[in-house]
Curated annotation (Swiss-Prot):
This is tRNA modification GTPase MnmE. Binds 1 potassium ion per subunit. It comes from Campylobacter jejuni subsp. jejuni serotype O:6 (strain 81116 / NCTC 11828). (6S)-5-formyl-5,6,7,8-tetrahydrofolate binds at residues 21, 79, 118, 442. The gene is mnmE. GO terms for biological process: tRNA methylation; tRNA wobble uridine modification. It is found in: Cytoplasm. Its main location: cytoplasm.
């Protein structure tokens, strides 16, 4: 990490200011050259003109120097607050490169912060999740995780396992001495408790992932029952083509919208029916796949048409699902000839006139999800908690069988999984993969 890196830290485009970030051994040197200053006071904002190597002015800017190790990365950092827009920050960045800086890789500032002990990989992931959060509720949950509760919990579990492993491996070296029964009981209890905690984290994260990522909603029904009209009404703008011709929607259409504090990702599917049209058949197959992926299903029927075999197929398709289903009787402003033979609790509405009742029902259902507890969005971390929990659970059983070597193997597996997200982890190849999806300048 001897080189000095630079990147634009703000979003690209027109704005009032743009921030260029510089980190590394030569950060202060480059800043002094650009500003024609002889010194900078750490953690003070300095208003200055910036010049290129031909002594031509680049911009007037605010410059802030963070002296190592008291900075985001743990290295010397200088941040330049220039005027916004497409050009000024780009010119400044080019000048820094000409002085000897290197363009930063995605997430490289955060990676350096982790390698220098300024944050754990877990906190870095939380910061990235917060940046990418798409709803107020998601931001609230992620911000809560950033306060350190999850990191402290994982570190405590890892420390418990390391201490236990060290003791057990010593006992293996002195095989003639059996572990005291009271100590065996303590270790067994520790394994049971920590396995349970990790299981709660990954099961809660999986069951409530919609609170962070957004709940997936699939609209399903036979052709021409008003699915596209319902999609447009939920989005409050015309996204899908509405036509009296059955089969107009042949592909799945996915859009996002907010209902209260919740993000919803809604999918309008092709009408499900028997068809010889090859393209429509593909659309029907995609519709069925969307049902599998959905968290919530809006099953739409037409109040103005007599129930037929195609409607029955929709009922049959949804008969064994464990997904939450809202049964919708659309076009209820017209003469109602649909017979509710399935005794479903239909929401009666007109997608082209008023869907207030559906929105209220959706909101009540979403509000029933408790946002408390530890939830994570990183699939990698969820899998690590699952693998660790299962390994610790297996270790408990092996301890009861006095298979200490296998017990140690399982504990090692759990420790290595948790260590990837705690403060002592240093494996560059995993960090490269983790931070490769981060923003430039972060």
């Amino acid at each position: 990490m001897s080189d000095t890196i630079a990147a634009i830290a703000t979003a690209h485009g027109v704005g009032s200011i743009s921030i260029v970030r510089l980190s590394g051994e030569r950060a202060l040197e480059f800043a002094l050259k650009l500003s024609h200053k002889t010194k900078l006071t750490p953690r003070h904002a300095t208003f200055t003109k910036l010049f290129n190597q031909n002594n031509e002015i680049i911009d007037e800017a605010i410059m802030i120097y963070f002296k190592a190790p008291y900075s985001f990365t743990g290295e010397d950092i200088v941040e330049f607050q220039t005027h916004g827009g497409f050009s000024v920050s780009e010119v400044l960045l080019e000048e820094l490169v000409s002085l000897g800086a290197r363009l930063a890789l995605a997430g490289e500032f955060s990676k350096r912060a982790c390698l220098n002990g300024k944050m754990t990989p877990l906190k870095a992931l939380n910061i990235q999740d917060l940046i990418l959060s798409k709803s107020a509720l998601a931001a609230k949950i992620i911000a809560r995780n950033m306060q350190g509760n999850l990191g402290e919990l994982l570190e405590k579990i890892r420390t418990d396992l390391v201490k236990t492993l060290a003791f057990v491996e010593t006992s293996i070296d002195y095989a003639d001495d059996d572990l005291p029964s009271d100590l065996l009981e303590q270790i067994s209890t520790m394994c049971e408790e920590n396995s349970k905690i990790l299981k709660e984290i990954y099961t809660l994260s999986q069951s409530k992932k919609g609170l962070i990522e957004g709940f997936k909603i699939a609209i399903v029904g036979k052709p021409n029952v008003g699915k596209s009209s319902l999609l447009n009404a939920l989005l409050s703008y015309e996204r899908a083509i509405v036509s009296d011709i059955a089969g107009t929607t042949r592909d799945t259409i996915e859009e996002s919208f907010k209902l209260g504090t919740h993000l919803l990702r809604i999918i309008d599917t092709a009408g499900i029916r028997e068809s010889k049209d090859a393209i429509e058949q593909i659309g029907v197959a995609l519709s069925k796949k969307s049902l599998e992926d959905a968290d919530i299903i809006l099953a739409v029927f037409d109040a103005s048409r007599v129930q037929d075999k195609e409607d029955e197929k929709i009922f049959d398709l949804l008969a064994n699902t464990d997904k939450k289903i809202f049964w919708i009787l659309n076009k209820s402003d017209l003469e109602n000839v649909f017979k509710n033979t399935q005794n479903k609790n239909f929401i009666k509405l007109s997608a082209q006139k008023d869907i207030t009742l559906l929105k209220e029902e959706l909101q009540n259902y979403l509000n029933s999800f408790d946002s408390e507890g530890i939830m994570v969005s990183s699939l990698d971390l969820i899998n690590a908690c699952k693998i660790s929990s299962e390994a610790i659970f297996r270790a408990k059983g092996l301890l009861e069988e006095s298979s200490l070597e296998l017990f140690a193997f399982e504990l090692n597996l759990a420790i290595n999984e948790l260590a990837r997200f705690t403060k002592d982890f240093q494996r560059d190849e995993i960090l490269d993969e983790m931070f490769g999806n981060f923003c430039l300048g972060k």
